[in-house]
């Protein structure tokens, strides 16, 4: 089969599918021209010494196809982002946590900037297996900051899992057979793993083994993680229990520490709600 025979059915199909608008016209060169954008809808192919007229897309049709493709890609990304969010294990209350809604104060302004840099530079962070360790008292915004990073990445279709050590250990109680291996593989399918409340787990051999297994598997897979804890760096660095120190050694090797300070947002919010309710019930 020569080139002309090979192209014949393709050209014929293109001719059948070509839409001719009433405003279209024949140009001086004998080719069909679009009546809207005044660019050719046909061209001449030279095949085996023959000149064959074939349909092509005019400029406005090319732009239309490009828009349709962009719309399709956006819809697919939205669906993928929605699916990734549903698989992220993130509590629904954090789905709306974003850098734009982050309440910036003198206490957290620096950390906000660092978290934004981490999120926008995540391609480099994952290449370097670089994670973060958020330390600080209860209510200082550690989990919220981690959720902001998670949502930034999820919006860009980066797989993220966000859970807590307490939840992990609750599930681990029911692991049978190879369920733990499959669970860890699921954790490691995410580009970023965020685990809340390191140190809130019970100090049993079982609990600490599970915590170590999760962190060590992530470490060995060269995948970044963000951990939050109410422990201080001093407490972690001076841990004398070998069960803890081997966990913390892994963390310090791949996680950059950031301390969160300032008043507890939870206490501030509780005080605001109390005063709001007091005024409602008792009057100003």
What spans do the regions from the language model cover?
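A conserved segment at the C-terminal end of the G1
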Residues: 147-151
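Residue-level preference for the first positions of well-ordered beta-strands
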Residues: 129-133, 159-160, 192, 224
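Walker B catalytic acidic pair
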Residues: 197-198
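A short, basic N-terminal segment
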Residues: 1-109, 268-284
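Walker A/P-loop nucleotide-binding motif
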Residues: 124-146
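AAA+/P-loop NTPase substrate/partner-engagement loops
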Residues: 153-191
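N-terminal pre-Walker A segment at the start of P-loop NTPase domains
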Residues: 99-125
């Amino acid at each position: 089969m020569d080139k002309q025979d090979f192209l014949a059915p393709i050209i014929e199909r293109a001719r059948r599918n070509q839409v001719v608008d009433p405003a279209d016209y024949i140009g001086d060169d004998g080719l069909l021209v679009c009546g809207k954008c005044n660019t050719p809808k046909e061209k001449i192919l030279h095949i085996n010494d023959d000149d064959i007229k074939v349909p092509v897309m005019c400029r406005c049709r090319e732009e239309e196809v490009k828009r349709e493709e962009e719309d399709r890609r956006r819809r697919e990304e939205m669906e993928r982002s929605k699916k990734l969010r549903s698989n992220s294990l993130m509590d629904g209350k954090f789905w709306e946590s974003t850098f734009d809604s982050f309440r910036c104060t003198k206490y957290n302004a620096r950390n906000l900037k660092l978290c934004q840099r981490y999120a926008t530079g995540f391609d480099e962070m994952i290449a370097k297996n670089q994670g973060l360790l958020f330390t600080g008292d209860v209510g200082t915004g550690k989990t919220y900051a981690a959720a902001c990073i998670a949502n930034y990445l999820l919006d860009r279709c980066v797989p993220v899992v966000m859970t807590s050590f307490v939840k992990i250990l609750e599930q681990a109680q029911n692991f049978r057979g190879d369920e733990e291996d499959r669970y860890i593989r699921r954790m490691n399918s995410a580009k970023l793993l965020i685990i809340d409340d390191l140190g809130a787990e019970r100090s049993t051999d079982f609990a600490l083994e599970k915590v170590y297994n999760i962190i060590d598997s992530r470490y060995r897979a060269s995948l970044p993680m963000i951990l939050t804890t109410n422990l201080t760096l001093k407490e972690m660095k001076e841990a004398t229990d070998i069960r803890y120190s081997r966990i913390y050694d892994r963390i310090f090797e791949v996680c950059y520490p950031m301390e969160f300070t300032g008043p507890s947002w939870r206490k501030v919010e509780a005080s605001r709600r109390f005063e709001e309710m007091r005024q409602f019930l008792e009057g100003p």
